[in-house]
Amino acid sequence: MLYNLLLPHIHNSHIANLFHYITFRSALAIIITLSLSFITGPILIEFLRSLQKNGQPIRSDGPESHQTKVGTPTMGGIMIILSSCLSTLLLADLTNKYIWITLFGFISFGIIGFMDDYAKVTKDNHYGVRGKSKLLLQGIISFIICVLLEYLDKSPSHLLNVPFFKNLSLDLGYCYIVFAIFVIVGSSNAVNLTDGLDGLATVPIAFTAGSFALISYLVGNLIYSNYLQLTYIPNTGELTVLCAGLVGSCLGFLWFNAQPAEVFMGDTGSLSLGGVLGIISVITKHEIVLAIVGGLFVIETASVILQVYYFKATKGKRIFKMAPLHHHFEKHGWAESKVVIRFWIISVIFALIGLSSLKLR
């Protein structure tokens, strides 16, 4: 909004000219989202606590230390969604189609998560909306997004770029749409599975969003994309502002979500954040890089899949003491803070590996 209002005055005002730069608007997005989180956080937490008598239901079969979390309100993802969307609407170019498509997906996945959180709180159990129902809704939203991208792009690309290899890409044809839906839905649920400890998912999400802020900027810049031999996709640079807003929102939320958490992001936050990261990776054609940068989410998801299939195949035996993987280490006696910080370190390593793929070819 501010960008569009100041655009006619860019050449006449030094201050207005600053808004011409994506980097300036991205930095401002981080500041705004952080400030909004600090200001609205206590108000939202108190409001959620007044509505939720028992807070988020805690699994009885989980680590014993989790029983101390009883009464902690959920749906804190509302704080992340509102601050991110507001900063994007203020600072991004509102004539950019990718901004609106991404915001549509972000909010839609947030609504699905809100429905799930609401069901958990009102029924006072941790099951919420049925898994198949959530997958169906996620699939429908992802399909709509893919159709919009196909329709709005004059020459939609169905190429899957392979990182670390020069000029290597796979033409998936219209199967790419199915693949893109899988990426978006998979990313949404992977982040959701990782969000099981205080602050655990928040920092890796911030690292991933920060990585894609850089990727969006490079892919949307003709000079940099040619130099790095990346697929040039015009107008994706504006997604840098949105990604920066996500970073600021997550850091602001971490202020209240650090152990012991005052609020949980819930599925409202995890499904929406995972979904928006998947959408951005599809738009920028860096789907595989998302799996690398967000490697922690992949590992957590793989641990659940392996646990379920092994349990069924062996009729009751388990690979891990408990899945997702972070609970396995808790069951081994690791303190929650140790699990969280070590997983943060792992996420930093994955982010660096993913970003190195931009140059190493």
UniProtKB/Swiss-Prot annotation:
The chain crosses the membrane at residues 28-48, 74-94, 99-119, 133-153, 168-188, 203-223, 236-256, 263-283, 288-308, 338-358. NCBIfam families: mraY. Pathway: Cell wall biogenesis; peptidoglycan biosynthesis. It is found in: Cell inner membrane. One of its GO terms (cellular component) is plasma membrane. One of its GO terms (molecular function) is UDP-N-acetylmuramoyl-L-alanyl-D-glutamyl-meso-2,6-diaminopimelyl-D-alanyl-D-alanine:undecaprenyl-phosphate transferase activity. Its EC number is 2.7.8.13. It is a multi-pass membrane protein. Its main location: membrane. PANTHER family: PHOSPHO-N-ACETYLMURAMOYL-PENTAPEPTIDE-TRANSFERASE, PHOSPHO-N-ACETYLMURAMOYL-PENTAPEPTIDE-TRANSFERASE HOMOLOG. The keyword Lipid metabolism does not apply. This is Phospho-N-acetylmuramoyl-pentapeptide-transferase. It comes from Rickettsia conorii (strain ATCC VR-613 / Malish 7). Pfam families: Glycos_transf_4 (PF00953). InterPro entries: Glycosyl_transferase_4, PNAcMuramoyl-5peptid_Trfase, PNAcMuramoyl-5peptid_Trfase_CS. The keyword Transferase applies. Its cofactor is Mg(2+).
